């Protein structure tokens, strides 16, 4: 198991899976799921990305809990990725299934999970979702998985706050106090970068590492990572739905050339 080193401002590449068993879009064959996952992960790693985050992106429309077939399939793919690559591996069980994410992480030896709704109460396409923090922390303790890092979104993309007066600083402070190992700030949707002012506000409110969770690109990597402590990158690496290694390399060249962190 490898943890994320936030001092290195990691770039975490998304491995978006095709539809899994138990969902409407599943083809009936796990072969293409494995093949695309392994190919995308290989392109990310060969392109210079330092960590991987696997997610059941193809299972849309999401529910708040994964079915047993989905959990089994996500675990199977994650296990193959864990065995094939030395990079830190994370689990995201979309939309907010902390139980599946933590259980899979413990079972396969993944180093971190992403929990989109950790302390907020939000309205999403799958209904009203409450904070996962109390149950997630109890489960992590029961699994004896304290080594699994929790990356917690605040006021996450594709949702509306049920209590809109809550500031993003308040959400970030609450996430930190509830045990998040890092805080994720997103724009309103995938591919949409969060306002730099929002990143600064969160960074000023907490001591935990702050990650950019959407919209990071070679054109804004310097501005965003001059403030933030790393980024999760998916959309900007893709061409025709798959990871494009040259796009990864192009981004990483910009990242390395512009990032004078010290």
Located regions from the model:
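N-terminal amphipathic alpha-helix/helix-capping segment at the start of soluble metabolic enzymes
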Residues: 1-28, 136-145, 262
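Hydrophobic faces of well-ordered beta-strands that scaffold small-molecule active sites
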Residues: 11-15, 52-54, 89-93, 113-115, ...
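Alpha-helix-loop-beta-strand connector modules within alpha/beta enzyme cores
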Residues: 13-14, 63-91, 131-152, 194-217, ...
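Active-site mouth loops of central-metabolism enzymes
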Residues: 16-39, 89-97, 152-169, 212, ...
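Conserved anion-binding
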Residues: 17, 24, 104-182
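Glycine-rich, proline-tolerant flexible connector loops at the mouths of alpha/beta enzymes
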Residues: 49-73, 120-125, 180-194, 238
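Catalytic cores of alpha/beta
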Residues: 96-109, 171, 205-233
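Glycine-rich phosphate-binding active-site loops on the catalytic face of alpha/beta enzymes
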Residues: 108-126, 178-190, 214-217, 227-248
């Amino acid at each position: 198991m490898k943890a994320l080193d936030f001092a290195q401002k990691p770039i975490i590449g998304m491995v978006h899976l095709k539809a899994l068993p138990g969902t409407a879009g599943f083809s009936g064959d796990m072969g293409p799921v494995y093949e695309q996952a392994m190919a995308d992960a290989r392109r990310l790693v060969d392109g210079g990305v330092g960590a991987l985050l696997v997610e059941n992106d193809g299972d849309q429309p999401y529910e708040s809990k994964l079915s047993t077939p989905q959990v089994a399939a996500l675990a199977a793919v994650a296990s193959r990725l864990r065995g094939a690559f030395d990079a830190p591996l994370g689990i995201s069980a979309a939309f907010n299934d902390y139980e599946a994410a933590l259980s899979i992480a413990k079972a396969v030896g993944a180093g971190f999970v992403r929990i989109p709704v950790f302390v907020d109460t939000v309205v999403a396409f799958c209904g009203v979702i409450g904070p996962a923090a109390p149950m997630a922390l109890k489960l992590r303790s029961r699994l004896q998985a304290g080594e699994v890092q929790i990356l917690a979104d605040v006021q996450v993309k594709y949702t509306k706050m049920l209590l809109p007066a809550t500031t993003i600083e308040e959400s970030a402070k609450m996430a930190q106090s509830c045990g998040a190992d890092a805080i994720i700030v997103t724009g309103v949707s995938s591919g949409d970068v969060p306002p730099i002012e929002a990143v600064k506000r969160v960074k000023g409110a907490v001591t935990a590492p702050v990650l950019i969770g959407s919209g990071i690109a070679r054109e804004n990597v310097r501005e965003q990572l001059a403030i933030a402590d790393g980024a999760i990158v998916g959309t900007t690496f893709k061409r025709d739905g798959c990871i494009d290694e040259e796009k990864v390399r192009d981004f990483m060249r910009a990242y390395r050339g512009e990032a004078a962190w010290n």
